[in-house]
A protein has these predicted regions:
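A residue-level marker of the well-folded mature domains of exported/periplasmic proteins
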Residues: 2-12, 22, 27-277
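Alpha-helical transmembrane segments
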Residues: 17-21
Length: 277
């Protein structure tokens, strides 16, 4: 998977949004110190570089490492100082990191949250200090102090994931068209979804199910475990270990310990896929 290429475009957009937000808030450009945007791209009024805090959820996924580095590189190329932190999928760690970014003088925050509802205190502090906040990929909910949201069309991403499963099962071509010589079924599959506290996860799942449902309805595909709702298949924090435990339980309870056929598994994330495998 070309992680950098796929997600790098969104990282570039986030860097552009950050630069634009700084300009709109009066943090960038020429200040009392006499620096101009042509000199550094982001000179603060005291002559120093403007600092941007970038909070990413984890380094256990190549995707988040690539995204964090891409945002950092884009902002540094524009002349900003960047404090990039990864939180190891631990909510208290991320809240502490964001608190520290604010204390250290960050003038804008780019946040890919672990839990989009767990940052109220940090967001309120940012709002009181007029620090713009960009929610990166994962929506931060229930707080008015989020200024921008940068993400994909996550339903369409889910459609692509569902189509990838159909293609892998030999039911469609790479463009999603039914094949005349496709297997008749029934083919056993199981479903996995992302974290229930991540707004994106439900969109991924709904998008995938929109293309899988016709095959489930006509019996070509069968979810043998019967676990077909988002709540039944969601993996908290997108964690590989949680996905592995669920897959092991499914194989034991539904597939005779692995002796019965399982044709494919829907997975929305590389880390979950590694746990499944």
């Amino acid at each position: 998977m070309k992680t950098r290429g796929f997600f790098g475009k969104m990282a570039t957009v986030a860097a552009t949004f950050a630069a634009g937000a700084l300009a709109l808030s009066g943090c960038a450009g020429g200040g009392a110190g006499g620096a101009s945007s042509s000199d550094s791209g982001a000179a603060a009024s005291n002559g120093g570089k403007v600092k941007v805090g970038v909070a990413m959820p984890t380094q256990t996924s190549e995707r988040w490492i690539a995204d964090g580095n891409a945002v950092k590189e884009g902002l540094e190329a524009a002349g900003y100082e960047v404090d990039l932190q990864f939180a190891n999928d631990d909510i208290p760690t991320q809240t502490q990191q964001i608190d520290q970014m604010i204390t250290n003088g960050a003038t804008i925050l780019v946040i890919a949250s672990i839990d989009g509802t767990a940052l109220s205190s940090q967001l309120d502090t940012a709002g009181s200090k007029n620090i713009p906040v960009i929610a990166y990929d994962r929506l931060i909910r229930d707080n008015e102090n989020v200024d921008f949201y940068v993400s994909f069309d996550n339903f369409k991403v889910g459609v692509a994931q569902g189509n990838a499963l159909l293609f892998g099962l030999g039911l469609t071509d790479k463009d999603g068209k039914k094949l005349d010589n496709a297997p008749k079924g029934p083919l056993n599959i199981e479903l996995f979804a992302g974290s229930p506290d991540d707004n994106n996860a439900k969109f991924f799942f709904d998008g995938a199910m929109s293309v899988l449902k016709p095959y489930l309805d006509d019996g070509t595909l069968v979810v043998k475990s019967g676990q077909t709702s988002f709540d039944q298949v969601a993996i908290l924090r997108w964690q590989q270990e949680v996905a592995q435990k669920r897959m092991e339980d499914l194989l034991t309870s539904t597939y005779g310990g692995g002796s019965e056929p399982l044709a494919g598994v829907l997975s929305p994330f590389d880390g979950i896929s590694r746990g499944i495998i």
